[in-house]
From Swiss-Prot:
InterPro entries: Ribosomal_uL22 (IPR001063), Ribosomal_uL22_bac/org-type (IPR047867), Ribosomal_uL22_sf (IPR036394). Its main location: mitochondrion. The lineage of its organism: Eukaryota, Amoebozoa, Evosea, Eumycetozoa, Dictyostelia. It comes from Dictyostelium discoideum. Belongs to the universal ribosomal protein uL22 family. It is found in: Mitochondrion. This is Large ribosomal subunit protein uL22m. The keyword Ribonucleoprotein applies. It comes from the Eukaryota.
Amino acid sequence: MNNLIKGISNVTLRCVSQTSATSTSLFYIPSITRCLTKKCYGNKSTTILNSRINNNNNVNIRQQSTTAASTNIFQQALKETKQEQGEEKVKVEDNKIVRVSLQKLGYSEWKLMALFKALSGLSLREAMAQLSFTEHSPSKKLRGLIKHAAHVAENIKGMDPERLIISQIWAGRSFYKRSIMWKGRGQGSTIRKPFCHVSVEIKESEFKDGEKKVGKFGKTNKTFSKYDGNFDHTKEY
């Protein structure tokens, strides 16, 4: 306000409210030489014009409460649209979904992205078969994570183990463990070992008339029918 107003003498401002014209309040500011200035008194935005100055150096300040009313109307309309959209969506029961996570896995999250894309949507037995064939080093820990999720789904939530599929599996960055790699002539460099967090979500697929598979591949894949839970290198798949 001080940057926009020049002068030394004080001017009495008379604030006229839209709701009650009788209630007034006085403000003292330097004399106005600008055409238009804006200032917020408290929580209400006001506008001061040179053309509104009276002979007694009184300025009427109009309180703009229309903005607050418009925002309230907009928020109310937004809530109504959200409620209508929420009623149209079909909610999945929480007792049909299991989420488990594995913290501080010593592997890069970027190297696991391709594997997780292949695992998402598979049935539980098919996912275990794929993890038995993969060359990723944390595949054994990932199999233990999926087995733990299947145990929770079957014994705690009472879900059918034959109809479990992996709906989502993702990884998040955790931290880097630093170490020193020594080289010749007294030199060395820093090694950063990445760690990540892995989360998996499994759910029970709904039964459909005439279905031939469970999950993305299900019983139509050859490895599903030949895999019995243990990988044997001498056996042909």
